């Protein structure tokens, strides 16, 4: 699934098997919507103008797929840092569960997974979150909790609802345009998963880690759009 390089060695577009090359602007009305970091600071999509942004949807109460996405992003971040691109690339996870994913909960999640300071964990007002994800074409909806209900890992209380959502990675170029989209579950089986993150996984999450679906994406594959957008080869961590 790696992208093709020309004779100059400049990385080319990623494989169509990984996702779709697009060229979609993010309107000022969306880019300027107010978001909040886990530190409680205001920000927006437009605040990252000049950087390549890898944006993923998630919720902190997911213990199946979302932690595997987070794990892959952590691996990708290390590879980007090793390539000397830390100032040019930003990784961000934006919740689809803003009612529960407060800045305080995002901080607890950051501590749990060991995310570096340069990785953004974002929330916002529900209407803002809905506008952004609808504009970007990522589907999610609140659904009833199963029976018996799961348990909130932070409070120990029974969960009262869940959020179904599409698993997506969106790559924004330095001008703020969406240039590549990956839709599908992550394959973290070949990546070094932190012990704390592994313990956080539910039984289904551990099964997905051990036996990923054939159509999933790996951290190494998901680096190719970043290499294309920065014009710099990026070697997977540990290679």
Give each language-model segment a name.
Residues 52, 58-59, 77-84, 113-117, ...:
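Sec/Tat-exported extracytoplasmic proteins
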Residues 28-29, 52, 164-166:
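Short, small/polar residue-rich loop motifs at catalytic or cofactor-binding pockets
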Residues 50, 184-188, 230:
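A short acidic/small-residue loop/turn micro-motif
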Residues 70-132:
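Structural microenvironment flanking redox-active thiols in thiol-disulfide oxidoreductases
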Residues 1-36, 219-239:
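N-terminal targeting signals for export/organelle localization
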Residues 118-204, 208:
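Thiol/selenol-based redox catalytic cores and closely related redox-interacting motifs
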Residues 190-239:
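Extracytoplasmic/luminal low-complexity segments enriched in Pro/Gly and acidic/polar residues
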């Amino acid at each position: 699934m790696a992208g093709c390089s020309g004779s100059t060695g400049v990385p080319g577009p990623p494989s169509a098997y990984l996702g779709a090359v697009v060229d979609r602007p993010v309107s000022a009305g969306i880019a300027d919507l107010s978001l909040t970091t886990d530190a409680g600071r205001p920000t927006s999509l437009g605040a990252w103008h000049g950087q390549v942004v890898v944006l993923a949807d998630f919720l902190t109460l997911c213990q199946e797929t979302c932690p595997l996405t987070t794990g892959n992003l952590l691996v990708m971040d290390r590879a980007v840092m090793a390539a000397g691109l830390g100032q040019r690339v930003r990784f961000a996870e934006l919740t689809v569960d803003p009612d529960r994913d407060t800045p305080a909960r995002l901080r607890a999640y950051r501590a749990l997974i060991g995310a570096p300071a340069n990785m953004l964990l974002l929330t916002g007002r529900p209407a803002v979150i809905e506008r952004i994800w609808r504009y970007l074409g990522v589907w999610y909806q609140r659904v009833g909790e199963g029976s018996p209900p799961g348990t909130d890992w932070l409070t120990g209380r029974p969960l009262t609802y869940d959020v179904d959502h599409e698993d997506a990675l969106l790559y924004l170029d330095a001008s703020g345009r969406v240039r590549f989209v990956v839709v599908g579950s992550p394959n973290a089986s070949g990546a070094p998963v932190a012990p704390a993150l592994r313990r956080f996984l539910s039984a289904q999450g551990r099964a997905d880690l051990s036996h990923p679906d054939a159509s999933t994406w790996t951290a190494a594959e998901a680096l190719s759009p970043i290499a294309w957008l920065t014009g710099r080869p990026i070697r997977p961590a540990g290679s």
